[in-house]
UniProtKB/Swiss-Prot annotation:
<dbReference type="InterPro" id="IPR011332">
    <property type="entry name" value="Ribosomal_zn-bd"/>
</dbReference>
<dbReference type="InterPro" id="IPR002677">
    <property type="entry name" value="Ribosomal_bL32"/>
</dbReference>
<dbReference type="GO" id="GO:0003735">
    <property type="term" value="F:structural constituent of ribosome"/>
</dbReference>
<keyword id="KW-0689">Ribosomal protein</keyword>
<dbReference type="Pfam" id="PF01783">
    <property type="entry name" value="Ribosomal_L32p"/>
</dbReference>
<keyword id="KW-0687">Ribonucleoprotein</keyword>
<dbReference type="GO" id="GO:0015934">
    <property type="term" value="C:large ribosomal subunit"/>
</dbReference>
<dbReference type="InterPro" id="IPR044957">
    <property type="entry name" value="Ribosomal_bL32_bact"/>
</dbReference>
<protein>
    <recommendedName>
        <fullName>Large ribosomal subunit protein bL32</fullName>
    </recommendedName>
</protein>
<dbReference type="GO" id="GO:0006412">
    <property type="term" value="P:translation"/>
</dbReference>
<comment type="similarity">
    <text>Belongs to the bacterial ribosomal protein bL32 family.</text>
</comment>
Length: 60
């Protein structure tokens, strides 16, 4: 069986474990048509554009 050569220090263990609990940041890009914040590679919910194309009409 595989056995670790050396004991992992408490500092190293806690440092590795802390990454699990870190809050994830959401990537946000700007719509080229209206300038509203939107998720990347998705249709803008404010104006209905994806890139330079109108994908759907937004009900106002």
């Amino acid at each position: 069986m595989a056995v670790p050569k050396q004991k992992r220090s408490r500092s190293r263990t806690h440092h590795k474990r802390a990454k699990i609990y870190r809050a994830f940041s959401v990537p946000v890009s700007v719509c080229p048509n209206c300038g509203a914040p939107k998720l990347p590679h998705r249709v803008c919910l404010n104006c209905g554009h994806y890139g330079k194309k109108q994908v759907f009409e937004v009900a106002e």
